[in-house]
From Swiss-Prot:
Disulfide bonds: none annotated. GO terms for molecular function: zinc ion binding. Keywords: Cell membrane, Membrane, Metal-binding, Transport, Zinc. It is found in: Cell membrane. This is Probable inorganic carbon transporter subunit DabA. HAMAP family: DabA (MF_01871). It comes from Staphylococcus aureus (strain MRSA252). Its main location: membrane. GO terms for cellular component: plasma membrane. Belongs to the inorganic carbon transporter (TC 9.A.2) DabA family. Part of an energy-coupled inorganic carbon pump. InterPro entries: DabA. Forms a complex with DabB. The gene is dabA.
């Protein structure tokens, strides 16, 4: 029992190296390093380079591209290098240090000829022999790696590749529940038991290997322990060994991790997976592991050779000259080369890139407020800053204070505003909001797209229920969509007719005899569909929508807002009256909308439209778990229109005028249009005027927003009709890049809208409304940081990882992806499950970067004590900042910027 508990603990701790991977149909951004944030970003980068040869720093080409585009100021980098050298003293001639730094900072690789030079071997052996204990251990420590990584097969590849192919085959078979007619036998018992049953008959194993499988224990934990003992792995190395196996196929391991969290009967899936993988490794390795030299020693020896070669190359000191020095001097040189390795300079380039963006963002805010200050006849805005030092910055933003100095002025602004539109914080809403505000007396607001409603939605036009909230939070309520009984019966019949047609097609395709007839039966129709979709994608989509509207028109629906009893539901259905009041109050506070209500308040979720796109869900609302957020917007708008809710809000200190009406809409990010989801039948005169005014200017807004967005797409030249072109892109099934999604996201600003209003943030910023003056205890800020900001960081790091290490964290080329098992994409039929973003989502061309891989900059508009309190109360966020997983900056009421590093 003690051993089994130990195995459980090992697996539980080892899960830190992977992240749960949701099916592609409900794709939600995940931070691939969330479980590793107890360590610094730099330490994790070094560890990943050691154990998987994965580099998570921007490479030389990305750095050079950033410099060429003006995104990275070289002077900032040079200052960082100077500051670093001043912190250390080395007893080395200065000209060697200068040569070394000048060469290594270009990130050029050491030529192979240096590694293969005999003198380098001599120096490395000398150091390893004389200084092994105090140098190899202090300079470099390697985790134990899977045995199969150290054995090379007859084809010249690590034996672990054969292990991977076996695991891909078996995991695909287990995961697939919907695409194949036959599922894996005995899968209902467990993955491990189903594999035991089938592997005994798998002739890819030898007869002797199949006999070993027959004799395996029924308990996967016992199997894991048996294999680890067979390989003589020390107990203190169990976790590192298991981590190596999880990192071998992080995609397939990730989907199993996700399923283990979703279903109680699959909670031990990772244990089953590891037991199978370790057995396969044992069978394929056989007795060869006995002849394998100690991996750590050989890697330490190789590390010495690399470090010696680096010193000789970058310092321009020939190896024969190096040999003329005594051992102590050589140790000093190599210590310097080890300390000042290439990863150190990659990290400095990354920091300089981030500091450059931080400086440019402050300059944008400064320039924006200078223009506002001139218009309001307030004091001139002065900026004094030392960007290279990256310390506190002083910017006098008197314009902000002039705009919203007190509540009376805020109320005055509110009465002149026709409509207030609350958008999701998604970076794609920033340009759209800017164009709306420029088009008339409209005010925009930023809030997470789930609008603070922890719900699971049960929509009439969706086959499955969906958790419509951030993936790190479980739903607490279920909201059902329903219509009049007659309308629902008609709609259900239409749905069944359509689904039966698709089911019949699938059934024929997956069975031997009927599949022979299928080409003749479906060929003419599918050929015509292919031609029309290829030649006239936009018209084809419009025609399809008309047919769908005629034959499968969704009826007018209502929502189960009030609490209902449903014995079939594992969640409460609907809200109590007090819960409705509480959620409305919380949402309004998060929007910083508790006074000065406009006559018309629109809650705008967002959705994306694309055709033939497996990663469609990645373009939807991240705060709603990879789905459109119009459902949440409609629910909150309906709640806020209820008289009893308004009465409760009034008692809580929030008065909504009777003339104010809430409505819901969706911002379609691929076409930059606003589609109405819910507009009450009765509008006040002022609300009706605002509604009509907004509709009148929306075509112009859409044209401007689309033109700005399409100009950034690499395959488009001059656009004369941006709206039509955007619709064509969204309809074209051959288009690999219907929109950029959240590429280039870089910052998350939490503050009053006046801080950034009218400033072109280039669609790179998440914008969340917040007023620290109304948040006395800091709970609102903590909520924003723990929810929306966390989602934004996950999105940011997924884009980052997919850019810097696309082979490991991305999903490859869209044109060669294969949708597999209904859960994700592969490259070919024997790759890992690709769980990141495609190449086209982050790159403009094969060698042209689009997304800028920098860590998220969180900006909080609040005094220092508010930010200090946040860091003291939120240890999870404070750790992200201190371990360099994101950057934090604040701006106080006097306009002084401060970097919290």
């Amino acid at each position: 029992m003690t051993t089994q508990l130990n195995i459980n603990s090992v697996i539980e701790n080892a899960k830190r190296v992977i992240t749960p991977l949701s099916p592609i149909s409900i794709f939600a951004a995940r931070n691939p390093w969330e479980g590793l944030e107890a360590d610094t970003f730099e330490d994790v980068a070094k560890w990943l380079r050691d154990v998987r040869d994965v580099d998570i720093f921007p490479n030389k080409a990305l750095i050079e591209s950033a410099v060429a585009r003006g995104e990275l100021d070289e002077s900032v980098f040079n200052q960082l290098v100077t500051d670093m050298l001043l912190e250390h003293h080395y007893n080395i001639p200065q000209h060697y240090i200068n040569l070394y730094i000048d060469n290594i900072k270009t990130l050029k690789d050491v030529p192979a000829s240096y590694m293969n030079h005999s003198n380098v071997d001599v120096v490395a052996d000398l150091l390893l022999e004389k200084s092994k204990r105090d140098m190899a251990e202090s300079y470099h420590h390697y985790d134990v790696r899977p045995m199969s990584d150290a054995i090379i097969d007859e084809q010249g590849e690590p034996l672990s590749e054969q292990v991977n192919r076996q695991m891909i085959k078996w995991t695909k078979l287990y995961i697939d529940q919907f695409l194949s007619s036959w599922t894996m036998p005995k899968r209902e018992q467990s993955f491990y038991h189903a594999w035991l049953h089938l592997a005994q008959h798998d002739h890819s194993f030898t007869k002797a290997q199949r006999q070993v499988i027959k004799g395996l224990p029924n308990d996967p934990k016992m199997t894991i322990e048996s294999v680890l003992n067979h390989f003589s792995i020390a107990q203190e190395d169990y976790q590192a060994y298991v981590e190596g196996h999880l990192l071998a196929l992080p995609g397939w391991a990730g989907i199993l991790y996700y399923r283990s969290q979703q279903h109680h009967f699959e909670q031990h899936l990772l244990t089953d997976y590891l037991a199978i993988r370790l057995v396969v490794e044992q069978l394929l390795v056989g007795d060869e592991f006995k002849s394998v030299t100690k991996d750590c020693e050989s890697r330490s020896e190789n590390w010495f050779k690399q470090t010696v070669a680096s010193w000789c190359y970058y310092s321009d000191m020939p190896s024969d000259v190096l040999l003329q020095h005594d051992v102590n001097e050589i140790q000093t040189f190599i210590h310097f080369a080890a300390t000042m390795n290439k990863n150190v300079f990659k990290n400095l380039w990354l920091i300089a890139w981030e500091m450059t963006y931080e400086s440019q963002l402050k300059q944008k805010i400064k320039a924006g407020h200078e223009s506002v200050a001139g218009a309001l006849d307030v004091n001139q805005v002065n900026v004094t800053e030392n960007d290279n030092a990256n310390q506190s910055h002083s910017v006098s933003l008197n314009a902000t204070q002039a705009v919203d100095e007190n509540n009376s002025e805020l109320n005055q602004v509110g009465t002149s505003t026709k409509a207030q539109i609350a958008f999701c914080i998604d970076v794609r809403s920033e340009p759209f909001r800017r164009h709306i505000e420029a088009a008339g007396p409209f005010e925009t607001i930023g809030i997470a797209g789930f609008f603070g409603l922890p719900i699971q939605k049960d929509a009439v036009d969706e086959q499955f229920k969906h958790d419509s909230l951030p993936v790190m939070v479980p739903p607490a309520y279920r909201i059902k969509e329903f219509a009049d009984r007659y309308d629902m019966n008609v709609y259900r019949q239409q749905q069944q007719t359509m689904s039966s047609m698709f089911y019949t097609f699938k059934l024929m395709k997956n069975n031997v005899m009927p599949s022979l007839l299928l080409p003749e039966l479906s060929g003419p129709f599918l050929s015509l569909s292919t031609i029309v979709n290829s030649i006239m994608p936009r018209k084809s989509r419009v025609s399809l929508q008309k047919i769908k509207q005629k034959w499968l028109k969704k009826p007018e629906t209502k929502l189960t807002i009030d609490r209902e009893f449903d014995r079939t539901s594992d969640l409460p259905v609907g809200f109590t009256e007090q819960e409705q009041i509480d959620f409305a109050l919380q949402a309004l506070k998060l929007m910083d909308l508790t006074e000065a209500f406009a006559p018309f308040v629109v809650l705008a979720g967002h959705a994306s439209h694309s055709h033939n796109n497996p990663h469609h869900a990645s373009l939807e609302c991240g705060a709603c778990g990879g789905a459109s957020s119009g459902f949440n917007a409609k629910l909150l708008a309906m709640i806020c229109n209820r008289p009893n809710v308004r009465q409760g809000l009034k008692q809580a200190g929030v008065y909504i005028p009777e003339t104010t009406v809430f409505a819901a809409a969706e911002h379609h990010t691929s076409t930059d249009t606003l589609a109405w989801v819910y507009v009450p039948d009765t509008l006040s005169a002022l609300a009706l005027d605002a509604y009509e005014s907004l509709n009148d200017v929306m075509p112009m807004i859409s044209e401007h927003a689309n033109r700005e967005r399409l100009d950034k797409l690499p395959t488009i030249g001059r656009v004369n009709h941006p709206v039509e072109e955007a619709q064509r892109f969204a309809s074209d099934w051959s288009e690999v890049r219907p929109e950029w999604g959240l590429a280039k996201n870089a910052s998350f600003i939490i503050g009053r809208r006046q801080l950034t209003k009218g400033i072109d943030l280039e669609g790179r910023t998440f914008l969340h409304n917040y007023d620290w003056r109304k948040d006395k205890d800091g709970k609102l800020l903590n909520t924003i940081i723990s929810g929306p900001a966390l989602v934004a960081q996950w999105i940011n790091l997924q884009y980052y990882a997919s850019t810097v290490a696309p082979h490991f964290y991305g999903s490859g080329n869209k044109a060669t992806q294969t949708v597999t098992s209904g859960v994700g994409v592969m490259q070919g039929n024997a790759s890992d499950l690709m769980y990141g973003l495609s190449w086209q989502s982050v790159m403009a061309a094969d060698r042209t970067m689009y997304h800028s891989p920098i860590r998220l900059l969180v900006v909080v508009q609040a005094p220092d004590f508010v930010v200090a309190r946040l860091l003291a109360n939120n240890e999870h966020f404070a750790r992200k900042v201190s371990n360099h997983w994101l950057r934090l900056m604040s701006v106080n009421e006097e306009g002084r910027f401060k970097s919290w590093i």
